Amino acid sequence: MPYASVAGLSLYYEELGPADGTPLVLLHGAGGTIDDPVGGWAGLASSFAETYRVILVEHRGHGRTDNPAGFMTFEQMGDDLAGLVALLDLGSVHLAGISDGGVVALDCALRRPDLTRTITVVGANHATHEGVAAFAATLDPDALEQAAPEAAAEFGRRHDQGKEPGSWKELMRQIVANNLSNPTWTVEDLRRIACPALLVAGEDDPFATLEQMATMKREIPSAEWLIVNHAGHPVHFEHPEIVGPRVLDFIARNS
């Protein structure tokens, strides 16, 4: 099981595909893990690995990665990723992130353009909004444990690996705190993203709204988008037959 010591973390990651292939780093969303097909890329990673050297990362506090800092921000997660890219000597990479993972990809495009060849942003925002805040207010771990014990147990199974039992509750609190105040990028920030960007969203996504996607499409100089009809937040999971080929086509055109 590969771990990398970066940014004071024991960061868990896995690799698929040819070792000499062009690197494609896949980032899961909040509460996701490498083996999660809804919050992560588990359903598409193997098909991507037929062509690319795929690196899947578990963010700080998630899955098998620890988080000694006791809090998390998107900048932290961007720094963690940059540290892994440097440690593995990957050079400039293609990044594809779901939800919060998409925000991390945007962060890297802004702060580490030297490491970012393209970004694929699935169901992510450039600025937090009332819909995110309303959902975050429902994510009380103690209430979840009472109302949906099976869901709470599954979340614990995924995120307490190698940690104290019940660590998943603190992770959930950290996710909520981060998303209530971040991200806060302006249109001026978006205009500074120099790499090609593919923006993917379901038309019914209440979090990554079409308004936010339209703003990013308009302001990021080399952006294109894919809006999938009758799809929600986990659009990659609901319609892998649409999202997967489009991601591969986008990366191939920008390699």
Question: Positions of the model-derived regions?
Answer:
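Conserved HGGG/HGGXW glycine-rich cap/lid loop of the alpha/beta-hydrolase fold
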Residues: 7-66
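Conserved acidic catalytic loop of the alpha/beta-hydrolase fold
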Residues: 75-93
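Flexible "cap/lid" loop of the alpha/beta hydrolase fold
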Residues: 103-111, 115-151
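Active-site nucleophile elbow and catalytic-triad environment of alpha/beta-hydrolase enzymes
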Residues: 174-189
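Short beta-strand/loop motif that positions the catalytic acidic residue
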Residues: 193, 199-201
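Short alpha-helix in the alpha/beta-hydrolase fold that links the catalytic acid
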Residues: 195, 209-218
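Acidic catalytic loop of the alpha/beta-hydrolase fold
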Residues: 204-208
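Catalytic active-site module of serine/aspartate enzymes centered on a nucleophile-bearing elbow/loop
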Residues: 223-224, 229-255
